[in-house]
């Protein structure tokens, strides 16, 4: 879920040198440790309950692996399963074993559920290995017994090898003969070992191969990388039916009264749906427990309402109950929360880790879990994604494009000593307006007071100022004003170059440099449509002469429109830049990047251009 404030785009600068960018096609393997052995064996029963035995050996190759591996958390859900550590020890190069005693196996609450009693069954058992040094092997054997299956009579699992050198990585599934297992395997070799009567054993061994570094903004490794997904579900429709059977909601009298109170005065179905979703967003605290880890059965809608918190499926359950009370039909929609855009070939929860709400009559998707995204918009992480509608078993797709416009007007009044007074007015329209508003509300007063100083400091400027937010207008736009002073905008007397800023922070620079984070690309990457206009004006005193201004730039390709205009008006320099990135998708290919690269390079050069001035 997108939790970082969009204020970054309006207030924080980004600087980067194209020539210093990372290169694609580099090895992504982490050689600090080696997975010498990982063997996972599931023994599954007809009701879906199962036992997992894990036997692993990790070799520490480098010092940095000690901190990452000396404490090994293993998660489980106490309401669904038990977890027992069979054996754990540090094995020294001479063969000596330093055992992990019971005092060094600790249970910790999952961070997301620590303040949420309904989810306190989600815990980590942390194994603390003793005396770990380079050259040691960390040996761990544990057993997890799932006595309550997520879906009665079904089983599914997904595994992704870690980015370490791999010796043996084996997955074994011992199944009842009457529970055929389907698989989606990438870089895993299948075999069928001997099995006991009435059983069938499936085995997959990982075939090690080079794995490229995951590039900046790349889609999830699950979209293209090595993994094994297995499932007893015959198809996604059966998977949807199994989820729906466990996600029934009840409309209680308090829920009905609340829905009526919130919507009775509203004239349209859409207004009612948006109002109810916003109420859940603003009043039900979200607990970030993924589908699967916290089970698949939502708490009763009334319980969620009473407790005022819940995970994604609880949000959906309460919103569905409220919508039903208002006469609006809806369905849960299973989706990936993250940067995975490809469904596995077999139904498995590893990718479908989130659920949102779909209103068929309005063709409207709602996600009330992100407190910073107003109803009618969606978090970026769920845009243009395939969803599984559990009420019908059909597939749907979330919108790819939503309003996203930013404009800013920046004015500097430069003094003879090189300092300057400045004012910046920024307007955010669309999905990011509420994100920005929420970000301001969430800031500590002390942080807000220092915001302008920190922004200036990122440019190497010394100064301060005030940051104010105007009341929302009828369109819900976010409008902010920054007034301040910098002591060292330009290093006079010169002649000297000063960066031709068109906004105080973020904006076009952030968008362009996000594209420029890689010099080459071999993986698909996330690219969100947006439209930004920036104007700036530098007024110089009479004793400062403007010697040169940058040349105008105009660029256009299939996805990018960019222009930069520079004009001298008396002793002032006026800059206007416009950047528009638009495409019907939110994922770009390496070929798209190659086509955009000339424009990206030209935009970077323009953003680094300078105004040359000199004081008499």
Give the role of each language-model region.
Residues 1-5:
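Positively charged n-region of N-terminal signal peptides that target proteins for export
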Residues 8-20:
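Bacterial N-terminal signal peptides
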Residues 23-616:
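A sensor for short, sequence-defined functional sites
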């Amino acid at each position: 879920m997108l939790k970082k404030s969009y204020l970054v785009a309006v207030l924080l600068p980004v600087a980067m040198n194209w020539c210093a960018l990372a290169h694609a096609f580099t090895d992504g393997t982490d050689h600090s440790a080696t997975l010498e052995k990982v063997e996972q064996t599931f023994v599954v029963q007809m009701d879906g309950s199962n036992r997992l035995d894990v036997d692993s050996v990790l070799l520490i190759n480098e010092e940095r692996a000690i901190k990452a591996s000396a404490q090994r958390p293993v998660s489980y859900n106490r309401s669904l399963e038990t977890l027992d550590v069979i054996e754990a020890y540090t094995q020294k190069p001479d063969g000596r074993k330093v055992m992990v005693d019971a005092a060094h196996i600790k249970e910790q609450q999952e961070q997301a559920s620590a303040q949420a009693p309904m989810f306190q069954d989600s815990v980590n058992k942390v194994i603390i290995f003793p005396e770990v040094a380079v050259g040691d092997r960390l040996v761990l054997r544990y057993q997890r017994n799932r006595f309550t299956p997520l879906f009665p009579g079904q089983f599914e699992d997904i595994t992704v090898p870690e980015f370490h050198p791999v010796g043996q990585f084996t997955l074994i599934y011992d199944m009842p003969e009457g529970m055929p297992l389907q698989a989606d395997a990438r870089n895993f070799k299948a075999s069928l070992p001997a099995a006991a009567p009435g059983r069938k054993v499936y085995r997959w061994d990982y075939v090690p191969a080079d794995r490229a570094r995951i590039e900046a903004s790349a889609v999830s490794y699950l979209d293209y990388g090595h993994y094994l997904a297995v499932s007893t579900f015959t198809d996604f429709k059966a998977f949807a039916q199994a989820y729906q059977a466990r996600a029934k909601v009840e409309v209680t009298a308090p829920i009905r009264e609340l829905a009526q109170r919130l919507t009775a005065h509203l004239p349209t179905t859409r207004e009612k749906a948006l109002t109810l979703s916003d109420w859940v967003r603003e009043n039900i605290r979200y607990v970030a427990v993924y589908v699967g880890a916290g089970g698949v059965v939502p708490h009763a809608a009334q319980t969620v309402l009473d407790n005022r918190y819940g995970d994604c499926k609880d949000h959906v359950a309460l919103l569905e109950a409220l919508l039903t009370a208002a006469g609006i039909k809806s369905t849960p929609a299973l989706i990936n929360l993250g940067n995975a855009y490809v469904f596995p070939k077999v139904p498995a929860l590893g990718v479908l880790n989130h659920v949102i709400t779909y209103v068929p009559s309005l063709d409207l998707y709602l996600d009330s879990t992100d407190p910073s995204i107003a109803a009618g918009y969606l978090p970026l992480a769920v845009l243009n994604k395939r969803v599984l509608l559990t009420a019908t078993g059909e597939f749907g797709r979330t919108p790819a494009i939503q309003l996203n416009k930013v404009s800013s007007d920046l004015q500097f009044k430069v003094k003879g000593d090189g300092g300057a007074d400045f004012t910046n007015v920024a307007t955010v329209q669309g999905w990011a307006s509420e994100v920005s508003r929420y970000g301001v509300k969430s800031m500590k007063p002390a942080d807000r007071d220092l915001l302008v100083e920190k922004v200036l400091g990122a440019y190497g400027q010394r100064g301060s100022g005030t940051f104010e937010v105007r009341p929302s207008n009828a369109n819900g736009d976010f409008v902010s004003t920054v007034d301040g002073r910098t002591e060292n905008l330009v290093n006079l007397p010169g002649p000297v170059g000063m960066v031709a800023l068109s906004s105080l922070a973020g904006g076009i620079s952030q968008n362009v440099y996000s594209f420029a984070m890689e010099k080459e690309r071999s993986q698909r990457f996330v690219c969100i449509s947006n439209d930004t206009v920036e104007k700036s004006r530098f007024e110089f005193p009479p004793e400062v002469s403007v010697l040169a201004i940058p040349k105008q730039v105009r660029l256009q390709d299939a996805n990018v429109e960019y222009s930069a205009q520079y004009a001298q008006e008396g002793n002032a320099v006026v800059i206007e830049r416009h950047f528009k990135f638009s495409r019907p998708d939110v994922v770009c290919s390496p070929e798209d990047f190659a086509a955009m690269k000339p424009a990206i390079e030209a935009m970077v050069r323009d953003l680094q251009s300078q105004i040359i001035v000199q004081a008499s």
